[in-house]
Amino acid sequence: MLENLVVDNFFDNPDEIRKIALSRYYRYGNDNRGRSGWRGERSFPIRSLDKVCPCCQQEVDADFYSEQKLLIEYSKKIFDMCKKHFDIGEFNEEYTVTAYFHIATEKTLDSMPFFDQSKFHQDTGPIAGVVYLTPDAPPNAGTSILYAEENRIVNVENKYNRLVAYNGHRIHALSDAFGTTRETGRLAYTFFIHSALDPLHYD
């Protein structure tokens, strides 16, 4: 598999995407049906154009539907870019992409003991990544990816509207978190490319 994919200025309209993100409902990592939790807060999955809101089971309004359609179009763009960049033999129609908005603040750093060690993890799907959505974020609050065979860690800096995609099976983590509110915290559009036969794992 090739090295990480980094694309600056990914969203055509990052301010609009950020506004959508800050309007969404969020869940904490320990709210996801007993499965291992994520770090910080996440929106409900962005995967399909549903007429019913997953958080309240009410019919969505036209504005929400339009937002969801826009986000899914960007997710498809991410899928196509990753398919072109990464050399994965099994990367075919059996794979799909699930995305979320994800917020990590200073509170996230206290969410588990020894956070600097505990934050590192692997994903089940072949590709994962983020698009950073906090203007003027600390550069050192990006993404850290372990290359064990080379005994090194690659740190991708946090830059507004930068996309980074990487091998999800590599050990990785957010490099750091910051801010005290959703508006000032580390906001990202987080995505996973995974088997279409296993969507519930990404709820």
Each language-model region and where it sits:
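Catalytic core of non-heme Fe(II) oxygenases with the double-stranded beta-helix
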Residues: 105-203
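Non-heme Fe(II)/2-oxoglutarate
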Residues: 1-118
